Regions:
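Acidic-basic catalytic patches of nuclease active cores, encompassing PD-(D/E)XK
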Residues: 1-48, 73, 80
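Conserved catalytic cores of phosphodiester-cleaving nucleases, focusing on short active-site segments
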Residues: 34, 56-77
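Short connector loops at helix/strand junctions that flank enzyme active sites
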Residues: 51-53, 62-66, 84, 102-105
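Non-catalytic C-terminal interaction segments of nucleic acid-processing enzymes
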Residues: 6, 15-18, 113-177
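Beta-rich nucleic-acid/ligand-interaction surfaces
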Residues: 46-57
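Generic preference for hydrophobic/aromatic residues in regular secondary structure cores
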Residues: 36-44, 67, 76-96, 116, ...
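Catalytic cores of nucleic-acid endonucleases
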Residues: 9-17, 43-44, 71-122
Length: 177
């Protein structure tokens, strides 16, 4: 991706460009793994990426499916390293629009240090809606485990859910790195 495209895609809240760089790196790694499995992979159109939360289309023996790829994340901006235990789930994005959980992707691919855990989105929605206390909003990101959280000055609505619980309760498969 060119520097010009990077600037176009960078969110105004991503002041350093770190978020877009991390996300693009995860997408490139996902592509490499898919290609190593001899799968056909196609980039979503920019509009699909932004409005439908679809990054890629993958064709395998089951057919073609869409995926939204999520890079490893820190639980808090103050953390120095990304971690693999807790997954940030987005109900609403920073503009207050539909978050990626309710986007049009068939699957969500969560990057970890060792793999991508690829989860059926419908089963993820069902699980998250069942375990997150939507009536309990917290002020700090460190308290967002199974509770809703909004960042100051933004319209997003987020929560954190344990990846191990997602794997226990949602349809998924794993691609090793």
């Amino acid at each position: 991706m060119t520097e010009q495209n990077l600037t176009i895609q960078k969110n105004k809240y991503d002041k350093t460009g770190e978020c877009i760089q991390t996300g693009l790196g995860a997408e490139q790694l996902f592509d490499q793994i898919a290609e190593s499995k001899s799968l056909e992979i196609k980039n979503a159109k920019r509009r699909e990426n932004i409005h439908k939360h679809i990054d890629k289309y993958v064709t395998d023996e089951t057919g073609t499916w869409s995926v939204d790829i999520k890079a490893r994340k820190k639980t808090s901006r103050s953390n120095s390293q990304a971690q693999d235990d807790w997954i940030w789930i987005e109900f609403q994005n920073v503009r207050g629009n539909t978050g990626w959980l309710y986007g049009d992707a068939d699957r969500i691919a969560f990057e970890t240090q060792d793999n991508f855990t690829i989860v059926e989105k419908d089963s993820l929605i069902k699980y998250v809606e069942n375990v997150v206390d939507m009536g309990k909003s917290v002020k700090y990101s460190s308290q967002a485990q199974y509770k809703t959280y909004r960042r100051a000055g933004r319209n997003d609505l987020l929560t954190m859910v344990e990846l191990s619980e997602i794997k226990k309760n949602c349809k998924h498969f794993v691609w090793e790195k």
